[in-house]
Amino acid sequence: VISCSSYRQAARQLGVSHTTVMRMAERLGRHCLLFQQRYLNGIGQLEEPVAVDGFETFEFSQYTPVHLNVAVGARTHFVYGFTDSELRRKGRMTQAQRARRAFLERTFGRPDPRAIEKEIAELLRLLPDGRVELRTDEHLAYPRAVRRSARIVRHTVTSSKSARTPRNPLFPVNLWDLLIRHSSSNHKRETIAFSKRRQNAAEKLAVLQVWRNFLKSFSEKKQDATPAMRLGLLERKLSVDEVLQARLFITRIGLPVRLQRYYFRETVTRRIPNGRTHDCTLAF
């Protein structure tokens, strides 16, 4: 899931059906949502600035772009969470492409123009308690999202044109965007392994999030502490076996309502209105 292999590539290597790999990835995504939340529930107060940005990708086709809104700790690089926002296709288009976009919007509906504002507000509510020192670029939806969230926020803005060096206040979230692009086959430029549903993209991102926070060193060269260690949640790195050693249940871990939509697979793709949900009786 995090090695930049598509489901079919992984299936060929393992000698199984690609649907088997897909089902296991879905289950792993649900587990990682709960695993992350179990540690987040133990954080008392937010004690570091948080950098927030929107990672742009798409679902089903390039006519349906999506923002994965992510929040990263400025000092620890701990990934606190994510939400998603449907977007309207923008940028330069031919007349035929504009006509195609218009047809799709008449048929399936048009994305909410305030989707980023609403989902950034949801993301802010997912953060631990306390005053939020928020760092973002100059996107106009962010100040509105701050007001909508009802959190106490100190908001500072950095130009998206500033050099993306370690001195940039948004460096932690820019680095996370880079790692997502680097480690995920569904987000590569001009890929044919793109996510058909953003629900699947969210599940893969949940796995990548746990890997980044609990298994990966802050620095690959130094092989030092993980973000979770820097945040004080753990004293050592975890292994894959330790992450998977016990089954986790949503009835025993307080998963926020916004994240429950990912857990139960309720994130709907307009072009696939009957996408599979997670409603197995024995799963609870």
Predicted features by range, described:
Residues V1-F284:
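Residue-level recognition of single "structural anchor" positions
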